[in-house]
Regions:
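C-terminal accessory/tail domains of diverse enzymes
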Residues: 1-169
């Protein structure tokens, strides 16, 4: 595996000079763009993503960039990985609990808190662009958190059930 393709959820990237290694390029000139790798593709959309999802990514990534972000110690790294795995494998389970630095919380509570904390960013993006697209998409995400039947995974499960298709097929 080449050094600029190591797996991580978000990769810092830069187009380097001819013959320059990716890490050398980043060290020399900084991050030019990021590659977001842990976003699900929506199977019901021709491109896998639509404009509201792009607006949500704008909100989320801007919000992330504005957060204090110290170094992650080994214990926190392990907790993040456990939470990630739980959401991937059990994310539809009602009442799913995750570990935070301050104790356990449900996925629904944590997601709601995160979406609420993103509200000012969505408002600023909308104010700057004279529209309400970001606040609208934040509302759509809140609806999915409150009622998982609005998620793409719920739609997939409904189709499987309606067509009598086993999940493993």
């Amino acid at each position: 595996q080449i050094e600029n393709e190591y797996y991580s959820n978000i990769r810092p990237k830069r187009v380097g000079e001819s013959g320059e290694k990716p890490l050398e390029s980043l060290a020399r000139a900084g991050i030019q763009y990021i590659e977001v790798r842990s976003t699900d593709v929506n199977p019901f959309l021709p491109l896998g993503i639509d404009v509201p999802q792009m607006h949500f990514m704008d909100i989320f990534l801007t919000w992330c960039g504005l957060q204090e972000s110290g170094e992650i110690d080994d214990a926190e790294y392990e907790r993040i990985n456990r939470n990630f795995s739980k959401v991937v494998y059990e994310g539809r389970r009602p009442g799913l609990t995750l570990e935070s630095a301050s104790g356990e919380t449900t996925l629904t509570e944590w997601a709601t808190d995160l979406l609420n904390s993103m509200q000012p960013v969505a408002s600023l993006l909308d104010d700057a662009n004279h529209h309400s697209f970001h606040l609208d998409t934040l509302g759509q995400q809140r609806l999915k958190v409150a009622d998982s039947s609005h998620t793409p995974s719920a739609k997939v499960l409904r189709i499987l059930e309606d067509e009598n298709i086993e999940f493993a097929e």
